[in-house]
Structure formats: C-alpha cells, structure tokens
Amino acid sequence: MSNVLELTIPASTANLGVGFDSIGMALDKFLHLSVKETSGTKWEYIFHDDASKQLPTDETNFIYHVAQQVASKYSVDLPNLCIEMRSDIPLARGLGSSASALVGAIYIANYFGDIQLSKHEVLQLATEIEGHPDNVAPTIYGGLIAGYYNDVSKETSVAHIDIPDVDVIVTIPTYELKTEASRRALPQKLTHSEAVKSSAISNTMICALAQHNYELAGKLMQQDGFHEPYRQHLIAEFDEVKTIAIQHNAYATVISGAGPTILIFSRKENSGELVRSLNSQVVSCHSELVDINISGVKERIVYQ
C-alpha cells in the first residue's frame, strides 16, 4: 500500500482593516487532509463534514485543479489519489478556506510528484495563484504576516510581526459571501490623497502592532479606506457586533477577509463575557474565541 500524506492546514483572517490584500493572521481552525494513491481510474474524495460534501468530485474540484496546475508547471504526472477531507473552516465566510485548500493542493502535488519544493517556493507558487499573500502566507508559516506580491517579477516578500497579545473573537454569519461578490463592491480607483491617507494609517498600524500598542493599533485598524467602507453594507450584523464590542472595551472590530465573518481584537479580561453577549444578542451568527495559530501547515507521512 502507498504511504499516506496527512496535512493539517490552518484557517486565516486577512486585512485586519487597513492591511488590504497584504496582512494576514493564521487561526486555529483547520482543514484536515489525508491523501494516498488509489488503484481507481480517477481521483476519489471522502468528505467527513457537511460543508465539504457540497464540493465537486470531478476535475472542477479546486484541490484537484491546483494540484494538476502545479504538476504541469514542474512537468510531473500525479497518480490517481484518494483524498479524505474534514474541515472546521466555514466556506465563503472570510476565513481563508480557499487559501487553505490551495496550500493543501500544492503540498499534495509536491509530495506525490516528488517535486521537492522549499517552503519559500510554496509561498511563491501559492501567491502567484491566489494573487496576493495575505491568506496564504500565514497559512503556510503561521502567525501574523505582512506581505507584498510583485505581479511583474512574480516575487513575494513577507515580514513576520509579533503575535498580538489579545484574544481573537470571530463572529460568523450563517450566510456565505463569495469573494468575487465582495470585490465587486470595491471602487476601481482611489484618488492619490485617499491612497496616501490609507497607506499612512496602515504603516502606523503595523508599527503599533510591532510595539504591542494595541490601543493605537485597534484605533487605526478601524480607519480603513481601502475596502471596509464599501463592504460593510454587505454584512447586516456588522454595526450591531461593533456596538457590542465597544461596550466591552474591545480594541477593534473589522471585517475578516472579504467577509461576512467579523473579527474582534478583545482584551483578555473581557473576551469571555463579550463572546457570550454576542451569542445571546446576535442570534443570526455564531461567535467564538479562536487562538492565533503559530505553526502554519503541518505535514506528516504515515508509512504503510
């Protein structure tokens, strides 16, 4: 029997307000993949959660598509594979489910195609496919990361930031919000003065995080001009959640990725009460505390 590739891939939250398409943080919600060769004539899928059961099992499957794309790039052929999947990352909720699947697909192609990619090369590939590093970088490395993708040179640069000493709360609506729909809400252009203002806010926010000044960082996270003003109307619960967070003296309330999940940076002494208040008052969502993931994707080979 063939060896089994086991992958544990974290979720991620992107933007942190003003860090649009650049800043991301890994979270302890996971996509679990167990992959082995099959004697069948096509790829097989075994889904262990209800959300994953909605995914296609033909060649339009995202993991299949990306894995074959990577294999083609390196001129290798992949065997037919059986993928067992279990995920507690909700789909189309702004928690990086597609980035987790993308990273998983690259690892699958790397192992079964014997490509021998370094982690740096995994990052470059993932960002080239995704178009920006805000989700894939923390998914690969863990922690809080700022990154930039040069679409001319096809080079990704990343910098790690200290893990914030805060409690993180995610408020997850029951409905999906596709990234494509959320991006359609954005303006095509910003004026020079608008771009300078948002860039200055983002720069200062990063420095505040690096200095562990969460009061200032949180204040600046909520002054975004790149995307939040254009997306908040798509999330009916945003204003109510932010009001409750303010009542509990939270540092910041922002959209997680493209939404609709709402991310809160909470003071540790207030986080439990805040989560309970959110769950009792905002009944159309589920709120929970989630740890910041520091390890990134984990790979394990089970020899059979």
UniProtKB/Swiss-Prot annotation:
<keyword id="KW-0547">Nucleotide-binding</keyword>
<keyword id="KW-0028">Amino-acid biosynthesis</keyword>
<dbReference type="Pfam" id="PF08544">
    <property type="entry name" value="GHMP_kinases_C"/>
</dbReference>
<protein>
    <recommendedName>
        <fullName>Homoserine kinase</fullName>
        <ecNumber>2.7.1.39</ecNumber>
    </recommendedName>
</protein>
<dbReference type="InterPro" id="IPR020568">
    <property type="entry name" value="Ribosomal_Su5_D2-typ_SF"/>
</dbReference>
<dbReference type="Pfam" id="PF00288">
    <property type="entry name" value="GHMP_kinases_N"/>
</dbReference>
<dbReference type="InterPro" id="IPR013750">
    <property type="entry name" value="GHMP_kinase_C_dom"/>
</dbReference>
<keyword id="KW-0067">ATP-binding</keyword>
<comment type="function">
    <text>Catalyzes the ATP-dependent phosphorylation of L-homoserine to L-homoserine phosphate.</text>
</comment>
<dbReference type="GO" id="GO:0004413">
    <property type="term" value="F:homoserine kinase activity"/>
</dbReference>
<keyword id="KW-0791">Threonine biosynthesis</keyword>
<feature type="binding site">
    <location>
        <begin position="90"/>
        <end position="100"/>
    </location>
    <ligand>
        <name>ATP</name>
    </ligand>
</feature>
<keyword id="KW-0808">Transferase</keyword>
<dbReference type="GO" id="GO:0005524">
    <property type="term" value="F:ATP binding"/>
</dbReference>
<dbReference type="InterPro" id="IPR036554">
    <property type="entry name" value="GHMP_kinase_C_sf"/>
</dbReference>
<comment type="pathway">
    <text>Amino-acid biosynthesis; L-threonine biosynthesis; L-threonine from L-aspartate: step 4/5.</text>
</comment>
<keyword id="KW-0418">Kinase</keyword>
<dbReference type="InterPro" id="IPR014721">
    <property type="entry name" value="Ribsml_uS5_D2-typ_fold_subgr"/>
</dbReference>
<dbReference type="GO" id="GO:0005737">
    <property type="term" value="C:cytoplasm"/>
</dbReference>
<dbReference type="InterPro" id="IPR000870">
    <property type="entry name" value="Homoserine_kinase"/>
</dbReference>
<keyword id="KW-0963">Cytoplasm</keyword>
<dbReference type="InterPro" id="IPR006203">
    <property type="entry name" value="GHMP_knse_ATP-bd_CS"/>
</dbReference>
<dbReference type="InterPro" id="IPR006204">
    <property type="entry name" value="GHMP_kinase_N_dom"/>
</dbReference>
<comment type="similarity">
    <text>Belongs to the GHMP kinase family. Homoserine kinase subfamily.</text>
</comment>
<dbReference type="GO" id="GO:0009088">
    <property type="term" value="P:threonine biosynthetic process"/>
</dbReference>
